Amino acid sequence: RQLLSIGMTTLFLDLEHKLYVYRFYTAFTLTSPMSWGAWILIVVYPISVLQILSSIRAGYPALASLVDQVAPGRTLVDWCERYRMQIALSVIPFAVALGIYTGILLSAFGARPFWNSGVLGILFLVSGMSTAAAMVVLIAKRHAEKDLFTRIDLVLIMAEIGLVALMLISLASGSGQHINALQSVMGGPYTLEFWVFFVTIGLLIPLLLEILDISGVSKSLAMLAPVLVLVGGYALRQVVMDAGQESTWTQYDTQYSSELLERLHEEDP
């Protein structure tokens, strides 16, 4: 919930017109990924609070004792404990929607060829699940829990590698502008970030380390794998955002006067 709070705060700070944020919630547009995202965020937050309250007495007894001193708080915690399983199950569809909607939002932005891929939404979802599993491995206290989520993350990393390959193939088999967009990570300005920080450091090395950990060959570097997965998750999003914003359907340098472009750059504050 703390990470969700940080994310929602940064989203709010990024808004150009912060006073009008309420307008997201005056209507719901079925065909708008932005509308879906706004409503998903507002629904996920209270459900996640209920999920925390369902285990607060077992996980945070000191905090639970403070909540129990207030009658409504005690009643709410009792209710959450009674319906813990139902609350946990209700979180799943909203969590999946939260993980996938960013990629869907970007892929719907047809003006940017690098984003215009049907694989992007699933890639963001699987990457988010992988980084979540890695975070659990880092903070879990029980060995059995660490081992379980290491195995889950191993499967997710393999799925992520397959999705990355599909995205690259999709761009390579697309229009000329999609191929040009692909060049940004195939020898272009984002090649290093994509292939070194994301693919190698964020996927391949953790994959190898987790295989060695599960097989019992080497456990000395086991805790390095989830850290690298988190680095890779960030690198993926940074590269996708930067490369996508630079990709375009119009080749300005060849279709417009170079003198006019130079003058526009000089006048740009």
Predicted features along the sequence, with ranges:
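Alpha-helical transmembrane segments
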Residues: 1-4, 92-94
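Transmembrane-helix bundle segments that line or gate the permeation/cavity pathway
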Residues: 2-19, 37-62
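Membrane-interface interhelical loops and short amphipathic "cap" helices
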Residues: 15-35, 102-121, 170-191, 239-269
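The feature captures the catalytic groove of carbohydrate-active enzymes
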Residues: 23-27, 34-40, 123-136
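Long, contiguous internal "core" modules enriched in hydrophobic/ aromatic residues
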Residues: 47-218, 223-225, 231-233
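Membrane-water interface signatures at transmembrane helix termini and the short loops
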Residues: 135, 235-237, 243
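C-terminal accessory segment of soluble enzyme catalytic cores
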Residues: 227-228, 238
